[in-house]
Amino acid sequence: MNNSNTDNIIIINDSEPTYNLEDVINEIGDLLEDFDKIIDQYKQTIDQMVKKPKYVNLVLSGGSIRGISHIGVIKKLIDEELLDLSKMKAVAGVSAGAMLGLLIVLGFTIGEIWDFILNLDTKKIVDPDFMLILEKCGVERGRIIYDLIEDILTSKTDTKHINFKQLYEKTGIHFTVVGSCLTTKDVIYYDHINTPTFKVSVAVRISIGMPGFFTPIDIGGKKYIDGAVLNNYPMNLFAKELDKTIGILICNEHNTNYKYFEEYFMAIINLFMYNYFEKTCHQYADNTIYVKKAPENVFIFNFDLDNNTKMKLFEYGIEAAEEFIKNKFDNK
């Protein structure tokens, strides 16, 4: 019996495999699509772990000493995780709102701001001189507040005369201070874009310059006064980002019971501005927290506040924020 030499031979096909280029491209595309989905899921997981605040832009109206209520509103928004001061993109402030806005931009926490207000002897930040009224059109030069602003700037930036460009480079927050030019009748928006080399301290001093009380600021022969006169609520600056913007408006009640000259004086000013601001307030109602309540002993030129009164203003701010949250979120 003859054994064939081929019985135990294994034949191997060593020819090159063939691939369809179109199929390979499709497979690569599918892999990339799956990879993108994985990345998206990962991002969603991270976002859930690190919750983003709803609002990153903040608008703060004027309101004189009643601006303390802003702090209560902000505290409530932070507690509800609607706002995070460490993640702000932009802050626009007028008058008292400009002062508070500066503290926020400089990185103060809401607790630090509240402690600052409680420890501040408000009656010592003004030194009225009624002999100035005829010569300077005001009774208070605002020097004490101006020096306070520069001390605060120095403590956080090491630069007393810091300008808007420098402040933006340090903080990354778009800070806008609103002023009014009495000479040209123009509203002025001080920020790192429009006025990059303008001193922040001067802009805030201009913005808090309540007519009739603080003397106007003269720059180059032009007079500058309180930003609230021409735009007390600059929500218009964020018209394209309303979904990310929240504003706080300190409302003046329009009544006919004038106990002080200051109330009578402000009622006249409010009468001139009433129609304009009524329209503005309603236009941005969905983005506005209205603070309507104030203690009876608080009026615009009264800087002598005890801590009990400050606390009431703070609590009225919290109440206003609670009402806003209830109407906007809880009822949906």
UniProtKB/Swiss-Prot annotation:
Its main location: membrane. GO terms for biological process: lipid catabolic process. It is a single-pass membrane protein. Glycans are attached at N2, N13, N307. Its EC number is 3.1.1.-. It is found in: Membrane. A motif (DGA/G) lies at residues 226-228. A motif (GXSXG) lies at residues 93-97. GO terms for molecular function: hydrolase activity. InterPro entries: Acyl_Trfase/lysoPLipase, Lipid_Hydrolase, PNPLA_dom. The chain crosses the membrane at residues 90-110. Residues 58-239 form the PNPLA domain. Keywords: Glycoprotein, Hydrolase, Lipid degradation, Lipid metabolism, Membrane, Transmembrane, Transmembrane helix. The keyword Transcription regulation does not apply. The active site is at S95, D226. GO terms for cellular component: membrane. Pfam families: Patatin. Probable lipid hydrolase. This is Uncharacterized protein L446. It comes from Acanthamoeba polyphaga mimivirus (APMV). The lineage of its organism: Viruses, Varidnaviria, Bamfordvirae, Nucleocytoviricota, Megaviricetes.
